[in-house]
């Protein structure tokens, strides 16, 4: 039997209570890590490694490599942005962290390959090659794989904006992690 008023389901003598629980992140943990010297050092090293100078604005996406996350639509939007606003070439870089998932499923491997191919095509179309002492510029810095918590917080700290473009998602903590 079901008691909607008490949110209880009784089945074969077993009682199950249904509750809605808001999911969140540990704000203090993220905030403390973001203020740490480890993250400060990582920020400087990461900017150098990526060739992103202080004046360059950074956008960020952190997603599982899953079609529900809207990564292809995001990449198309970024391509459109760089097509329409060439004045942002060299002044805006999008850092995409893509965390592999379901690698044993062929459709997910094909999706991963499509994402990689699209990032490469966009970068080839717009990137500025290195000359002399300059590191050059790529519109999209693509990082595939799991990242350590301090590295993730470093990316959040470096970012001027983050995009969450899920087309179908039950819960997504990226926005909460970013503002923490």
Where are these regions (language model features)?
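Catalytic cores of carbohydrate-active enzymes across secretory and cytosolic contexts
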Residues: 1-180
